[in-house]
Swiss-Prot record:
It comes from Rhodopseudomonas palustris (strain HaA2). The gene is ureB. HAMAP family: Urease_beta. It holds the Pfam family Urease_beta. Its EC number is 3.5.1.5. This is Urease subunit beta. Pathway: Nitrogen metabolism; urea degradation; CO(2) and NH(3) from urea (urease route): step 1/1. GO terms for molecular function: urease activity. InterPro entries: Urease_beta-like, Urease_betasu_sf, Urease_subunit. It catalyses: urea + 2 H2O + H(+) = hydrogencarbonate + 2 NH4(+). CDD domains: Urease_beta (cd00407).
Length: 101
């Protein structure tokens, strides 16, 4: 193996297979762009983003790790969210949860 080399199987790789998902319409009501990373607890995003926060609790963007979605001022877009995995304990972010989901 060469350092940094990736060995992957042939075929398609399905991200987040078998996890619960939800699609939400999200509007940036602010005057500045807002970018949300792949593993940010979507429930705790910038308050200028308007969407059904209750449906976003325990969810993150259903996108590849290390990527992000940008919301321009006045823009509304649909995003798919996926359930957080693991112990489903959330600390940090905006401090809205600080414990079990």
């Amino acid at each position: 193996m060469i350092p940094g080399e990736l060995l992957i199987e042939d075929g398609e790789i399905e991200l987040n297979a078998g996890r619960a998902t939800v699609t939400l319409s999200v509007a940036n009501t602010g005057d500045r762009p807002i970018q949300v990373g792949s593993h940010y607890h979507f429930f705790e995003t910038n308050p200028a983003l308007r969407f059904d926060r209750d449906k976003a609790r325990g969810m993150r963007l259903d996108i590849a790790a290390g990527t992000a979605v940008r919301f321009e001022p006045g823009q509304t877009r649909d995003v798919q969210l996926v359930a957080l995995a693991g112990k489903r304990v959330v600390y940090g972010f905006r401090g809205d949860v600080m414990g079990k989901l």
